[in-house]
Amino acid sequence: MPEEVKAHITGVVFQVLAKPGDKVGAGDPIIVLESMKMEIPLEAPRAGTVIAVKAKEGETVQEGDTVALLE
């Protein structure tokens, strides 16, 4: 079952660093959010393959939103 990567803070997607098919390690940044004038990386909770990125640059995401899926 895929694992969700969720936003832990409300913010604007500043940069998408991974795309479907990319292999990532635990702690690798997948998306960078901008919130309160700070850049906050959303990291992979474990090693795996990105199967979907659900957020686009410039989009606002809310705390708890799923921004990517890992397999």
What are these regions (language model features)?
Residues 6, 20-21:
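Short, flexible segments with low predicted structural confidence
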Residues 15-19, 52-55:
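Short histidine-centered loop motifs in beta-beta connectors
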Residues 21, 38, 58:
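Surface-exposed, flexible loop/turn segments at secondary-structure boundaries
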Residues 48, 53, 58-67:
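PDZ-domain C-terminal substructure recognizer with occasional recognition of PDZ-binding tails
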